Amino acid sequence: MHILIVNNTSIPVQKYGGTERVIWWLGKQLVKMGHQVSYLVAPGSYCDFAGVHVLDHNIPFNQQIPAGVDVVHLNCKVNETPKIPYIITLHGNTNDQAPLDINTVFVSKNHASRYGSASFVHNGIDPADYGDPGLNQSRNYFHFLGDAAWRVKNLRGAIKIAQKAKISLRVIGGKRFNLNQGIRLTFDPRIRFDGMKGGAEKNALLKGSKGLIFPVLWNEPFGLSIVESIYFGC
């Protein structure tokens, strides 16, 4: 089967990007199962196991579907409904009051139930991207993992928890200076900002962590950072 995976960002992900990681791993496993995979994604994308096409929102979507595609897997909004079989994965929460497409699938049971659905598929991770979890390694801090500029991830709350518990916190995914939120005046030496990290750098930080501090302010659809942290035993 020829499967077209569609998203409006580029692949492969370099640092932060849960959806990008999920569709990359999904495509890789589908190829291993014997399927043909193509991506329709943002400019600058490349892939060594599947074809890559550039998504252009100014062109009718159906004109961008490569010849021979059997099913379309949408991970973002497009400008028209596919004329061939398709499925939509909703990765986040939406405030749009319009009814969701009947082909929408969610990423957890709770996520689906909040939209009146029972259709969900959990995200997975590829252990090959993470390596040895270092379960016997010494650990001396906790971590926050996520886009700190996104208020619902509640970095402020994570810092307060760490300070009240008098523990060290590594902030993976945020900087001390943020033009959108102003200067974070966090002078506590136990709070360290590591910025956006990916690959080996992020893995090394997770290996040294005792646990994830994750006081989100919304209904988390899935939480890839939770699964990544569990993989490393923290």
Please give the residue ranges for each predicted region.
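Acidic donor-binding loop of glycosyltransferase active sites
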Residues: 144, 207-221, 234
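Conserved donor-binding/catalytic core segment of Leloir-type glycosyltransferases
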Residues: 118-123, 128-172
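Active-site proximal beta-strand in glycosyltransferases
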Residues: 3, 70-74, 82-109
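A short, active-site helix/loop in glycosyltransferases that binds the activated sugar's phosphate group
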Residues: 93, 97-120, 125-130, 154
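N-terminal strand-loop element at the rim of the active site
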Residues: 7-17, 24-61
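Nucleotide-sugar-dependent
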Residues: 14, 20, 149-153, 217-224
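Short alpha-helical segment that forms part of, or immediately flanks, the ligand-binding pocket
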Residues: 203, 227-231
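Nucleotide-activated donor-binding/catalytic signature segment of Leloir-type glycosyltransferases, i.e.
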Residues: 181-200
